[in-house]
Amino acid sequence: SRNAGALMQNVLYEVKRIVVGQDHFLERVLVAILAQGHLLVEGVPGLAKTLTVNTLAKTIRGSFKRIQFTPDLLPADLIGTRMYNQRTGDFSTVLGPVFTNFLLADEINRAPAKVQSALLEVMQERQVTIAGESHRVPEPFLVMATQNPIETEGTYPLPEAQVDRFMMKVLVGYPTATEEFVIVESMTGAIQGMQKALNNEEL
């Protein structure tokens, strides 16, 4: 609708106040949110991928979490687990970082297949089962998984069947010379002055 279009324009305006360039990437992120999909992003570190998603989360007053995928990561580190409380003698459920609106899975191909599968299951089911209890992730829910196309040593490539779980694959390139000049000019902590464009319920 026209109102929805105006709201998205407000979101774009606010994010672009902070993130210079990467318009193609930002637009794909918004498409994924509205279509309830997820993104697989390829690009070297330092291209504002984290900043873009974090800024977008702040713009809609959503929650944002980042997980650095490593070879020693466990599925429980993502989804959560049951913890024993010595003081009370009871078990309680501790939910993992997937319970957020915007999740950045940084270098997903650095974690073993069982961890990748745990994340992909949450992406598809939008819920987690811990000790027989189901817990739904919040809405909106967007997973942006990144891969570094240059450093592949010691990685666990995603099988094609798992790559298909993502709505789209986005290649993030370097900014232009003009954009780099603007970036240098604007390194003044502008993120502190952001305005809310809409909230989770409106989205």
Please state what every model-predicted region is:
Residues 3-47:
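Pre-Walker A (pre-P-loop) alpha-helix and adjacent loop at the N terminus of AAA/AAA+ ATPase modules
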Residues 28-31, 84-105:
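Conserved alpha-helical scaffold flanking the Walker A/P-loop in AAA+ ATPase domains
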Residues 39, 103, 141:
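Conserved beta-strand position immediately N-terminal to the Walker
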Residues 43, 106-107, 118:
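Walker B catalytic acidic pair
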Residues 44, 78, 146:
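P-loop (Walker A) phosphate-binding loop of NTP-binding proteins
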Residues 85-89, 107-115, 123-198, 203:
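Canonical AAA+ ATPase core
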